[in-house]
Amino acid sequence: MGKQNSKLAPEVMEDLVKSTEFNEHELKQWYKGFLKDCPSGRLNLEEFQQLYVKFFPYGDASKFAQHAFRTFDKNGDGTIDFREFICALSITSRGSFEQKLNWAFNMYDLDGDGKITRVEMLEIIEAIYKMVGTVIMMKMNEDGLTPEQRVDKIFSKMDKNKDDQITLDEFKEAAKSDPSIVLLLQCDIQK
């Protein structure tokens, strides 16, 4: 597949203006940058991981990037096209609290079965710890929790029916009633 068109088709632009929180000018700028970094118009996992390494140079971002990639790659084809990229970016940067919770839930729900298990949550929490690096994690992690202890703390607050899995409803309800849970999920417990 060669070089992509340098402009979005009018119908695509119209759809993205409706589907995202970006205006036409912003979308044009993002598209230009996307094509500069990805001339093929698609971003594969390796390229995506390289982007994360730039943002998190003190840790190992590869595992977290895999999970973020899976969440961005809505159609599951192993690449992220501009639409998938800009829609995910819109949610994570400008979306409503509800949209961000749905996105986060999808990231933590590794197998896509609509429930987050302790194993799934531990996988993401460990990836976050690795990504931010030891020095930064020590500053963020004032309570000294290990990834396993953090998962236990999150489950004690979210898993209302104590069935060792968190549904989307439990996830949203707990996050809305206790904002500190959102900070735990991000592994950012600074007051």
From Swiss-Prot:
GO terms for cellular component: cytosol; membrane. Ca(2+) 3 binds at D159, N161, D163, Q165, E170. Brain and retina. Neuron-specific in the central and peripheral nervous system. Increased in the cerebrospinal fluid of Alzheimer disease patients (at protein level). Keywords: Calcium, Lipoprotein, Metal-binding, Myristate, Repeat. Transmembrane segments: none annotated. Ca(2+) 1 binds at D73, N75, D77, T79, E84. Ca(2+) 2 binds at D109, D111, D113, K115, E120. InterPro entries: EF-hand-dom_pair (IPR011992), EF_Hand_1_Ca_BS (IPR018247), EF_hand_dom (IPR002048), Recoverin (IPR028846). A lipid is attached at G2 (N-myristoyl glycine). Residues 40-58, 60-95, 96-131, 146-181 form the EF-hand domain. Belongs to the recoverin family. Regulates (in vitro) the inhibition of rhodopsin phosphorylation in a calcium-dependent manner. Probably binds three calcium ions. This is Visinin-like protein 1. It comes from Homo sapiens (Human). The gene is VSNL1.
